[in-house]
A protein has these predicted regions:
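Phosphate-binding site recognition
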Residues: 1-122
Length: 122
C-alpha cells in the first residue's frame, strides 16, 4: 500500500522494527507530518476513519461492534483512531487474544480537531 512518490524516512525502519516485537504500534504527531504515509509502508489493509463517505458508518460500527473494524489483513492500519476512542480497548483485547506481533498500526493527530467555522456573514 505504498503511496506514489513516497520519500523514505527514518521512521520507516523504526515502525517496521516495532511491528516485529509489538502487537500494536501507535504513530502520533501533528496533522500533515506523514503519519499515514509512513504507516502505509507497513500496512496490509487500512480503515480511514475520516473518509467522508464512510466515517458515519465506521463510527457507528465502532460503537456497536468495534472488533469488526479490526478485521482484515495485518498489519491493519486504523487511521485517525482517536475519532473512535473505544477502538483502543478493542485493539488491546485483539492483541492479547491473537498473541502475535504486527497486528495493528494506529495513527492519530495530536492537533486538536477544528470544529465547524462560521464565516461571520449573516
Amino acid at each position: 500500500m505504498v503511496p506514489a512518490r513516497y520519500m523514505a524516512r527514518i521512521a520507516d525502519g523504526v515502525l517496521a522494527e516495532a511491528l516485529t516485537t509489538s502487537g500494536a504500534v501507535q504513530v502520533k504527531g501533528p496533522k500533515w507530518c506523514g503519519k499515514t504515509a509512513t504507516s502505509l509502508q507497513q500496512a496490509a489493509s487500512v480503515v480511514y476513519l475520516q473518509d467522508p463517505d464512510r466515517s458515519a458508518s465506521y463510527l457507528a460500527l465502532a460503537d456497536a461492534k468495534p472488533s469488526a473494524l479490526l478485521e482484515g489483513r495485518t498489519p491493519r492500519l486504523i487511521d485517525e483512531w482517536q475519532m473512535a476512542p473505544q477502538l483502543w480497548d478493542a485493539v488491546r483485547f485483539a492483541v492479547d487474544l491473537r498473541g502475535e506481533p504486527g497486528q495493528f498500526v494506529l495513527t492519530g493527530s495530536s492537533t486538536p480537531a477544528v470544529g465547524g467555522a462560521h464565516s461571520g456573514v449573516g
